[in-house]
Amino acid sequence: MAVAACGPSTTPSGPSPQPTPEPAPAPAPPSPTPPVVRAGFPGFDTGIYPGDAAMRTWRETSPYVWVGYYLPAPCRRDVSWSGKRQTLAGMGWGTAVIYLGQQDWAAVPGRAPAPRDTMPRDTVRRDSTARDSAAAPAAPPACSSAYLTAARGTTEAADAAAKTAAEGFPAGSVIYLDVERVTAVSPALAAYVRGWIDGVLADGRFTPGIYCHRLDADALRQIARAAYAARGRAGDAPFWVASTGGFTLEQAPRGVGLDYANVWQGRLDTPETWGGVTLTIDANVADSRSPSSPR
């Protein structure tokens, strides 16, 4: 019987097999960008209508959901916004109707008193068309502190209501009377504002509101409340208040420091670019998606 030889095996052997490497873990998906939480509804205003293409681009790419809608008015005669309501509504824009009535130019901070028969050359709303028209010798004066009377306020309220109706805004829509910043609300300005509010209430089709600076808001609110009470109208006039302190688009309108503010304008004459289109705007936040919608 054969016996196996002692000693190391002579059978050749190859390298030991290596374990298959584990695949690298897939990278974690990026964390989703948290949605922007807003307490109000951002909107903007700008003096001249930017054009349909620009408005469509901004509606698709910007955070803004409503826009100021200027009526032709004594201190702002440009008509570029006229006839655009349906176009803007079709794009999804809300609106805030603005009427720039008579102003107490002598009381505007930093402004020299204007001639009584012409509109100031540096009109607040950047309206070169209105300035040129007002300065033309053949044009009768339309914007003058000489017209700060209750009777004129009532007459121009009728004008504002007629133009708002002609633009197709529904009954109950808010028309904001633009009252630019003053050092103090004079008796003449108070009379004009009271007459204008009373005139819109008497017309019955629309709701009078006020645009003003924060420092003038309380005085103008008292005037508005008195006019509402005299007509037996419950509630307050809507207020659109301007003040730049602490403003962001995420704020609610009451962040301006007034609990009755429905709109806060907090960024002025600022160039912004959305979708490749640059506009110079005033930025606002409102308590509704369309600040002139019937309340």
Model-inferred region functions:
Residues 188-205:
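Long, well-ordered alpha-helical scaffolding segments within enzyme catalytic domains
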